[in-house]
Amino acid sequence: MSQVSGTDVPDLGRRQFMNLLTFGTITGVAAGALYPIVKYFIPPSAGGTGGGVTAKDALGNDVIVSQFLTSHNAGDRTLAQGLKGDPTYLVVQEDKTLANYGINAVCTHLGCVVPWNASEEKFMCPCHGSQYNAEGKVVRGPAPLSLALAHANVTDNDKVVFSTWTETDFRTGEEPWWS
């Protein structure tokens, strides 16, 4: 292997070095600033068939279906921690089984948590008076949309797992606005 003489090595002048340094700095800052903007516009990937979030009770414990159903009556709607940490109602059906859907408790008007009013059998928002029927369909505004749904599946180890609802909304017959 032969040695390269000093005259054959290209000389990086001061001006070229400063241009390279300036270009590198501007590129780094621009990439750092654009990253969150680009990430915002790229939708999150789907959870897949096995994906989901285990429902948690008010104390942060996993919801065990057999224990849950013994302590709740038919028609009950009970809050659990659901997808993205949102409060989500578990629904006990008339035959004392758990419904295969959960109802997100966040009001579609301004984001208040909507409590279940058992005596009137509907969800009533305390902030601005929006009302939803027992399935979470809006019946009185100012809320523009029904409450979001999530699948509530029972696993082999008797726990509830919430997953994203992407099918047609059975209450309205329309595509889900939340997916």
UniProtKB/Swiss-Prot annotation:
The keyword Transport applies. GO terms for biological process: photosynthesis. It comes from the Bacteria. It catalyses: 2 oxidized [plastocyanin] + a plastoquinol + 2 H(+)(in) = 2 reduced [plastocyanin] + a plastoquinone + 4 H(+)(out). Keywords: 2Fe-2S, Disulfide bond, Electron transport, Iron, Iron-sulfur, Membrane, Metal-binding, Thylakoid, Translocase, Transmembrane, Transmembrane helix, Transport. It is a single-pass membrane protein. Its EC number is 7.1.1.6. It is found in: Cellular thylakoid membrane. Binds 1 [2Fe-2S] cluster per subunit. Disulfide bonds join C112-C127. InterPro entries: Cyt_b6_f_Rieske, Rieske_2Fe-2S, Rieske_2Fe-2S_sf, Rieske_Fe-S_prot, Rieske_Fe-S_prot_C. Coiled coil: none annotated. It is an enzyme of class 7 (translocase). Its main location: membrane. One of its GO terms (molecular function) is 2 iron, 2 sulfur cluster binding. Its cofactor is [2Fe-2S] cluster. Residues 60-161 form the Rieske domain. GO terms for cellular component: plasma membrane-derived thylakoid membrane. The chain crosses the membrane at residues 20-42. It holds the Pfam family Rieske. Belongs to the Rieske iron-sulfur protein family. The Rieske iron-sulfur protein is a high potential 2Fe-2S protein. Component of the cytochrome b6-f complex, which mediates electron transfer between photosystem II (PSII) and photosystem I (PSI), cyclic electron flow around PSI, and state transitions. The 4 large subunits of the cytochrome b6-f complex are cytochrome b6, subunit IV (17 kDa polypeptide, PetD), cytochrome f and the Rieske protein, while the 4 small subunits are PetG, PetL, PetM and PetN. The complex functions as a dimer. HAMAP family: Cytb6_f_Rieske. This is Cytochrome b6-f complex iron-sulfur subunit.
